[in-house]
Amino acid sequence: MGKKSRVKTQKSGTGATATVSPKEILNLTSELLQKCSSPAPGPGKEWEEYVQIRTLVEKIRKKQKGLSVTFDGKREDYFPDLMKWASENGASVEGFEMVNFKEEGFGLRATRDIKAEELFLWVPRKLLMTVESAKNSVLGPLYSQDRILQAMGNIALAFHLLCERASPNSFWQPYIQTLPSEYDTPLYFEEDEVRYLQSTQAIHDVFSQYKNTARQYAYFYKVIQTHPHANKLPLKDSFTYEDYRWAVSSVMTRQNQIPTEDGSRVTLALIPLWDMCNHTNGLITTGYNLEDDRCECVALQDFRAGEQIYIFYGTRSNAEFVIHSGFFFDNNSHDRVKIKLGVSKSDRLYAMKAEVLARAGIPTSSVFALHFTEPPISAQLLAFLRVFCMTEEELKEHLLGDNAIDRIFTLGNSEFPVSWDNEVKLWTFLEDRASLLLKTYKTTIEEDKSVLKNQDLSVRAKMAIKLRLGEKEILEKAVKSAAGNREYYRQQMEEKAPLPKYEESNLGLLESSVGDSRLPLVLRNLEEEAGVQDALNIREAISKAKTTENGLVNGENSIPNGTRSENENLNQEGSKRAVEDAKGSSSDSTDEVKE
């Protein structure tokens, strides 16, 4: 996909003769592992730690220079082989071609008119690289012994990719040789480019991603050099940080969840050919057909011959796109910033507020979102703020009063205020909090816009500045929206306007918005706990997408798909202490605002 292609592409084969001994690198990686496994730094110390880790990583990269294997020629030179391989193995290759679209990079272009909802692309399971195929590969023996590979399918998939890339006769060579040689994820940012993200919400996840990737590399370098089941891996003599960063980014930008063959659970997969599609706003139009055992994609809209074919990756913020996919999407209708709010236990009404929130299914402390679109807050955040600002009398009404249950159900419905005073308080509170968050940035919106006019900015620097600008614009919109609502409800209160009456027939049931959704993103809109049942009809998948606005998300220029516990990115911390040395944590980059 698009913006990921670069000058040269990784190749299987042999690298340059090593000029540094494994023992020397082992000593450096041991130092790196120790540094990355230290407790989280205190407030204001994250940048210092990042620079220290980066210094060690750069020292390792310098000593390993020239050791990574590469493909000859350009990425696009191998596209014909990919199409031939895909066709011979049952994938659709008619009606589109791979083209460089400059701004968006490589993507698919229609060679004929394609109608909306027309099935135009399918890829059978045999072409997919999955955790299951990793288990059955040369990686299998090590996988069976290493708890980290077993616990983190994304890391297993990254090593599967590395092993197959280093095997000239790999079945997946036609796919692997068309992958980009490098990416625009923050793992590839120069230090000066990362500086542009300082004081943003995203910076915490950027630090976490870098630290966890370094920790994983340090851990697995030792494993590959010392574990008996790693002796036959083609990585034994050449496993560089550059290799691991590439594999991590390849998987992070492409991985998706699909059902296993028996349909009993989900697994991670890389989907050749299909992952060339670029992103636009819309609905999920890809599903997995268990009957035919293949990934299927229908057209998001009408595409005329000569037009680029887009798909929708999912309802992700630009922070998620930049960090996990390496691109910034202008006019992202699902963009948002995080805001962490909680009821203080020192609040004398804490117990009552906690009980009302519990009945509404909302925790007393949570990460919410302020959205790019109107309204800026979800039903869940509205309900939380209403409870947060309730008086003792209002709390009693929601716990013990007449129609208490109905009152709970309407907490998230903007049509039925608790009271005019409550509305004034909650919008005042939100206005103040968003204003405070805006003040934490080191630059203004106007300054960011001015910097973006600099023609000498790198692609990654521009992406970083756009991200911090986007965060501020969302917060500024929230401030203006909150101020407008505050004045409206203040006027209603002054005029002593009657509160809207509600009836059972028009109760607005509390539900999470897209922005606050934590449902797993799966090819077929399945929740892992429920298991995978009959294959979804494509039209049913589209219909369901309209309701849930969640489902399959695409690869290369896309977000990592699947449940957050397994593959939100390659750097998520596992639940078991035993594997902490190599697992990464997914810290929520939030600004905690607690009353």
UniProtKB/Swiss-Prot annotation:
Molecular function via GO: actin binding; histone H3K36 methyltransferase activity; protein-L-histidine N-tele-methyltransferase activity; transcription coactivator activity
Protein name: Actin-histidine N-methyltransferase
Residue ranges, compositional bias (Basic and acidic residues): 574-583
Superkingdom, natural source: Eukaryota
Modified positions (Phosphoserine) in chain numbering: 513
Region (Disordered): 1-22, 549-595
Notes on the domains: The SET domain specifically recognizes and binds actin, suggesting that it does not accommodate substrates diverging from actin.
Free-text description of this protein's post-translational modifications in UniProt: Phosphorylated by GSK3B, which is required for recognition by the SCF(FBXW7) complex and subsequent degradation. Ubiquitinated by the SCF(FBXW7) complex following phosphorylation by GSK3B, leading to its degradation by the proteasome.
The keyword DNA damage belongs to this UniProt entry's keyword annotation: no
Disulfide bond residue pairs: none
Binding residue positions for S-adenosyl-L-methionine: 75, 104-106, 254, 275-279, 325-327
